[in-house]
A protein has these predicted regions:
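Extracellular and organelle-lumenal recognition/adhesion modules and their flexible linkers in secreted
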Residues: 2-314
């Protein structure tokens, strides 16, 4: 006999442990029997689970975690993820999530090339947008703590007041509809220049028609600083409200508050961008040419008699 209990941010006591909603970090499983307490921060938890009759499943090798060294890494199928704080390296416990899809087709910067203006990653909106007088440079790409990134410089004296927009998808690449909630996330750091003569960075979600015409826009400021990229993951969720003409959504990193006649020179690092049809961000899902889905995590105890459960007495 196998029971099914949803995870609500705490560990249920028996049955199949599955997630329904935001990511859960599970640190202990108790309330079963004194000799069945499970420590999900232990390095040997996977062996302990197997020895006690539990089966962990997650199809596919697209799930990621932050390891004990602070490096973002992919994890093999059917392998429990023990996650860590990317800044303090503290163990957060077992990471259990529902299924999720990264709709950004290229989050690993495939096809990007340094230069002025250089080449943005394949399937990104190209070129980057800014008011007249603003130029762009792809400074380079690389990997930092397992996070694939691109460095983009925006500089010059604008002749109009507007935002600088770096679109991480084409105008029609992600099909969407009004009423849907989408969440964009990305690691962002300042690596050159400053935000002088701007109001700082931001994340945005731009609504367009199925043919790519502008419909509506929403964005939020983010406080971007210099330093290590790890720990600088920002998110923005928005319910699309453009009406019947909305047919696509475009995730963007912004430089906000650029004003006419005031020069700017800023270089930002963008890493591991993600776009999900959810109200919240889940763990990063790498992509290179197409949207990718991470399957749900599930922990099952097939024989509840092993924890003293007698179905005849229930």
């Amino acid at each position: 006999m196998t029971g099914v209990i949803p995870s609500l941010g705490r560990m249920p006591s028996l049955g199949k442990l599955a997630t329904h909603g935001r990511p859960d970090y599970w640190t202990t499983l108790g309330r079963i029997q004194s000799n069945m307490a499970l420590d999900f921060t232990s390095a040997t938890i996977s062996d302990t689970l197997a020895a006690r009759g539990f089966t962990f499943t997650r199809l596919g090798a697209t799930a990621t975690r932050v390891n004990s060294s602070g490096v973002l890494e992919t994890v093999a199928a059917n392998t429990l993820r023990i996650d860590h704080d990317p800044t303090t390296l503290a163990c957060l416990g077992g990471l259990f999530e529902e299924a999720g899809t990264n709709a950004i087709r290229n989050s690993t910067m495939v096809g990007a090339a340094a230069g002025s203006p250089g080449t943005l990653p394949t399937n990104w909106g190209s070129p980057a947008y800014g008011p007249a007088g603003i130029s762009f440079e792809v400074v380079g790409t690389g990997t930092e703590s397992g996070i694939a990134y691109i460095d983009i410089r925006a500089y010059g004296t604008p002749s109009a007041t507007d935002f600088v927009r770096i679109s991480m998808e084409t105008n029609t690449g992600v099909v969407a509809a009004t009423g849907q909630t989408w969440c964009v996330s990305a690691y962002v750091a300042l690596v050159g220049g400053s935000f002088a003569n701007t109001t700082g960075a931001g994340l945005g979600l731009l609504e367009r028609t199925s043919g790519g015409a502008f419909v509506a826009d929403g964005n939020t400021p983010i406080t971007v600083t210099s330093g290590a990229l790890a720990g600088k993951r920002y998110t923005y969720a928005r319910t699309l409200a453009g009406g019947a003409t909305t047919g696509a959504v475009v995730p963007q990193v912004l430089i906000r508050g650029v004003t006419s006649g005031n020069p700017i020179d800023v270089t930002i690092r963008i890493g591991a961008p993600q776009l999900e049809q959810k109200a919240f961000a889940t763990s990063y899902i790498p992509t290179s040419t197409a949207a990718v889905t991470r399957n749900a995590d599930a922990l099952t105890l097939g024989d509840l008699s092993r924890i003293g459960f007698n179905p005849a007495a229930s």
